[in-house]
């Protein structure tokens, strides 16, 4: 395959780049990407799965458009963002990148649904019939996933598993929304294996409702997620480093 030409992006000020610890000196983005892909490959082999069936979603929240452009030049095409207004500021610089797709993976308030539908190709965090109807009203074809809350943490968003039949029915009544699967965010733990029961439960819920897409797993626990059936892993820190001031 011929090399991908570098993305053409507006200049970014030195102060903007210096503010974020974008690419720690220990490794380049290319090296980090190779390491993440190797982890995905190894986990898929252990699970006797085809790694081509696993999407690497590069989570670029809080990083400038310049970073998206560099990741794109290295072959990444799927990007995740958590904040509508933040991505609205970056979108003019990146929405014209051929083949790039942008996923919303944060909590989406219904009053921002119209703007989110305009900016993103996939909304992974639909958690209520009301939000589904707001996205439908935007009149744009969208891929959607349903966020499921599988823990008792009050800070976590998502639909209760018992509410899934009603939510699935509501989404399927929306002609502009294409339902592709389920998404979850387990409670944080230093032990990657602590997330496995949550991943397994999401897979079982997807199977019960005839859905194939599973967005689960992040930088520290992607192996467990893949072994439990993830079709999309959301990776930020392992690619771009910690999101912190320099």
What are these regions (language model features)?
Residues 2, 9-220, 226-228, 240-242:
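Conserved alpha/beta-domain cores
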Residues 230-246:
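Gly/Pro- and small hydrophobic-enriched strand-loop and loop-to-helix capping segments
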């Amino acid at each position: 395959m011929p090399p991908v030409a570098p993305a053409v992006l507006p200049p970014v000020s030195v102060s903007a780049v210096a503010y974020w610890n974008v690419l720690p000196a220990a490794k380049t983005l290319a090296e980090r990407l190779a390491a993440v892909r190797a982890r995905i490959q190894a986990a898929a082999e252990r699970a006797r799965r085809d790694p081509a069936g696993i999407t690497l979603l590069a989570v670029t929240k809080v990083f400038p458009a310049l970073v998206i452009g560099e990741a794109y030049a290295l072959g990444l095409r799927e990007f995740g963002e958590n904040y509508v207004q933040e991505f609205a500021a970056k979108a003019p610089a990146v929405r014209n990148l051929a083949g790039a797709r942008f996923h919303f993976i944060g909590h989406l308030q219904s009053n921002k649904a119209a703007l989110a539908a305009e900016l993103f190709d996939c909304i992974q965090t639909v958690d209520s019939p009301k939000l589904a109807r707001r996205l439908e009203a935007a009149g744009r074809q969208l891929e959607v996933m349903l966020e499921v809350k599988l823990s008792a943490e009050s800070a976590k968003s998502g639909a209760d598993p018992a509410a899934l039949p009603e939510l699935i029915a509501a989404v399927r009544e929306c002609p502009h929304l294409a339902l592709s699967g389920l998404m979850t965010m387990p409670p944080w733990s230093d032990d990657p294996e602590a997330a496995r029961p949550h991943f397994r439960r999401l897979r079982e819920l997807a199977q019960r409702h005839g859905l194939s897409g599973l967005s689960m797993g992040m930088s520290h626990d992607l192996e467990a997620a893949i072994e439990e059936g993830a079709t999309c892993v959301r990776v930020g820190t392992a690619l771009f480093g910690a999101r912190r001031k320099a």
